[in-house]
Amino acid sequence: MELPKRLASMLAGDEGLTRQKAARLVVDLAKTAGAKAFIEVDHSHVSGVSVITGGHGLRRFLADLAGEGSVVIPTTLNSAGCDKRKMEEMDIDFPDFLEQQFEIIMAYESLGLETSLSCTPYDRGVEDEAGFASWAESNAVAFTNSWTDLITNRESGLSALATALTGYAPEWGLHLEENRVPNIVVDIECELSTLSDWSILGDWIGKQVRPNWNIPYGPMPFIRGLPSYISFASKKALTAAAANYGCPM
């Protein structure tokens, strides 16, 4: 497996320790996935923000990673564990939650991420974009693969961050056209008049999947009978619901 020149340079430590660590992760992921090449990525979206889900390990990891480098492509950040204005209402039973939460956010910011704190990076306007992304948020993955020309695998927070710091990802999975083939056919014979209808459709599609089906990249429905015009909100409702069942597109 031949490395792109810049990725090899990062792996050798020529661009600092932060990017060297990220490059090592990208290369290790490529070996694990059996990838034969790497692709240049245009945008990344990183999950793993809440101190409750990431714990002290996330804080230590980010503290260890920060300091010698920043992201090389536009990168947005997923939602945090709370709104600081709603702390009392949320009644979060976690010691020093707010302080630790903002420590994590500031660590990401120091790496150059846009602290958008949103799980819908497509709200920034990607309908006309094309190329490759590295997104670690299931509803965002389903939306962009379904409604735009921007292609992404369903990444982890760590793989999306490693790609953000290097600009590269292993070429595998949904990056390859042969893996983006519908494996379910859905015929619509009813009117979809409300956003709830679109959400129910996505939910219903997901519930048809059986554990014994051989669909390594998840269910990918080909939906027939949809109206010629679908609003942005309806698209969002459909793919967000279907993503709950592992639909990547």
Language-model features: where?
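Non-transmembrane, aqueous-exposed alpha-helical and coiled segments at domain scale
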Residues: 1-249
